[in-house]
Amino acid sequence: MSSKNKIIQELENEQLKQELPEFSPGDTVVVQVKVTEGNRERLQAYEGVVIGIRNRGLNSAFTVRKISHGVGVERTFQTHSKQVESITVKRRGDVRQAKLYYLRELTGKAARIKEKLN
């Protein structure tokens, strides 16, 4: 590793959030997002099922899917972004795959995820 890469790595490590909860695909999470409307800022809660996680250090991201008024809505969040205020795990899901893209095709009761019991 060159010295330039080490410097970049150190700078990225400083910006990583330390107090993140452990969550995995299939979990139902509530993400508090900072929303700026005009000159005021407020928090908006976005609740849904995590359908994918991308672990890339500072560039880590996760995708949350929810059904809003009968329409599926997916939103991708940068894990270490300043816009993401907090992440709360509401329910642990029991799934066997890392990416739950198949949920896009399912509707109603078929799209439910079993709860992890432990």
Curated annotation (Swiss-Prot):
<protein>
    <recommendedName>
        <fullName>Large ribosomal subunit protein bL19</fullName>
    </recommendedName>
</protein>
<dbReference type="InterPro" id="IPR018257">
    <property type="entry name" value="Ribosomal_bL19_CS"/>
</dbReference>
<dbReference type="GO" id="GO:0022625">
    <property type="term" value="C:cytosolic large ribosomal subunit"/>
</dbReference>
<dbReference type="GO" id="GO:0006412">
    <property type="term" value="P:translation"/>
</dbReference>
<keyword id="KW-0687">Ribonucleoprotein</keyword>
<comment type="similarity">
    <text>Belongs to the bacterial ribosomal protein bL19 family.</text>
</comment>
<comment type="function">
    <text>This protein is located at the 30S-50S ribosomal subunit interface and may play a role in the structure and function of the aminoacyl-tRNA binding site.</text>
</comment>
<dbReference type="GO" id="GO:0003735">
    <property type="term" value="F:structural constituent of ribosome"/>
</dbReference>
<dbReference type="InterPro" id="IPR008991">
    <property type="entry name" value="Translation_prot_SH3-like_sf"/>
</dbReference>
<dbReference type="InterPro" id="IPR038657">
    <property type="entry name" value="Ribosomal_bL19_sf"/>
</dbReference>
<dbReference type="Pfam" id="PF01245">
    <property type="entry name" value="Ribosomal_L19"/>
</dbReference>
<dbReference type="InterPro" id="IPR001857">
    <property type="entry name" value="Ribosomal_bL19"/>
</dbReference>
<keyword id="KW-0689">Ribosomal protein</keyword>
